[in-house]
Amino acid sequence: MQLSQIEREQLYAILEKYDQHPKVQEMREFIQHGDVTTYQHCKNVVLVSFWINRRFHLGADETALAVGGFLHDFYLYDWHKTSSFHGLRRLFELHGFSHPGSACVNAKRYFQITKKEQNIIQSHMWPLTFRHVPTCREAVIV
């Protein structure tokens, strides 16, 4: 599952302004899974999403797909640290439920993202994020 050199160049041209932002670079400081940083995880998600769209001719908006995929975990905290909340509130403060909202707030704070890109970010953990359902093909792909 690899993009061609031309496809990679096209993808990186879309992501360049985001990738160069200091806040995006902060994602390199946080571990996502195992020894994979949040930054590398987001990059992997974008590469796979872009590949799926191209190989299956899904016709997704590639800019929205790339931006939403790249920023989907732009939450900027160590999710392994435990919360101080208890009971039902703690359940909904758990990372799996709450991080898409945090990532979307950050993405809107530092970039002008579209409604479609917001939906990609907010719904990427659906059905855990039951209030944020994927409403576009790009969100389903991510």
Predicted regions and their residues:
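Metal-dependent phosphohydrolase cores
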Residues: 1-142
